[in-house]
Each structure stands twice: as structure tokens, then as C-alpha cells.
Curated annotation (Swiss-Prot):
InterPro entries (alphabetical): Huwentoxin-1, Huwentoxin_CS1
Swiss-Prot/TrEMBL domain comment: The presence of a 'disulfide through disulfide knot' structurally defines this protein as a knottin.
Protein name: U3-theraphotoxin-Hhn1i
Family classification: Belongs to the neurotoxin 10 (Hwtx-1) family. 51 (Hntx-8) subfamily. Hntx-8 sub-subfamily.
Tissue-wise expression: Expressed by the venom gland.
Cystine pairs: C54-C67, C61-C72, C66-C79
Classification via PROSITE patterns: HWTX_1
GO CC terms: extracellular region
Keywords annotated in UniProt: Disulfide bond, Ion channel impairing toxin, Knottin, Secreted, Signal, Toxin
Organism: Cyriopagopus hainanus (Chinese bird spider)
Keyword Secreted: yes
Any Pfam family: Toxin_12
Length: 87
């Protein structure tokens, strides 16, 4: 009887240890994609978009005029490509 109790205790302790190890490795794996994405999409000062006098594609055109090749959508007030049905 004692041997069965000891084996049950060891089995339970092993399962708890396995759970703790799996949880720790999973939490590290969750942080890895966040770190990878933040390093890929980190904005460097050299690559920041310069302020323009005109608004580009899908930019708000209430205060700024659209850049050449785009027209201001009357409904959404965004700069969009000119199309025959928008003329």
C-alpha cells in the first residue's frame, strides 16, 4: 500500500513539474514573436516619412490638397485614385 502511495505521489509531482516547465517555455515563446515584430518594424529616424504639402493615397484631404494623381473623395474625404465614376 505504501509503495502505491509513493508512486502516486511521484506521478502527481512529475505532472506538476511538467506543467510548470511547459508553462514557462510557453510564456517565453509568447514574448519571442512580440520582440521579433518590434525589431522588424522598429522605426528608424532615417526612414521616417517626411511631412508633405500634399496628402497621399488614403490620407485625409480636408485640410491638405491631394498629391498629383489623386483626387479627394467627396464622401469619405480621402485621397483616392481617379476613376471614371468619380469624375
Amino acid at each position: 500500500m505504501v509503495n502505491m502511495e509513493a508512486s502516486m505521489f511521484l506521478t502527481f509531482a512529475g505532472l506538476v513539474l511538467l506543467f510548470v516547465v511547459c508553462y514557462a517555455s510557453e510564456s517565453e515563446e509568447k514574448e519571442f514573436p512580440k520582440e521579433m515584430l518590434s525589431s522588424i518594424f522598429a522605426v528608424d529616424n532615417d526612414f521616417k516619412q517626411e511631412e508633405r504639402d500634399c496628402a497621399g493615397y488614403m490620407r485625409e484631404c480636408k485640410e491638405k490638397l491631394c498629391c498629383s494623381g489623386y483626387v479627394c473623395s467627396s464622401g469619405w474625404k480621402w485621397c483616392v485614385l481617379p476613376a471614371p465614376w468619380r469624375r
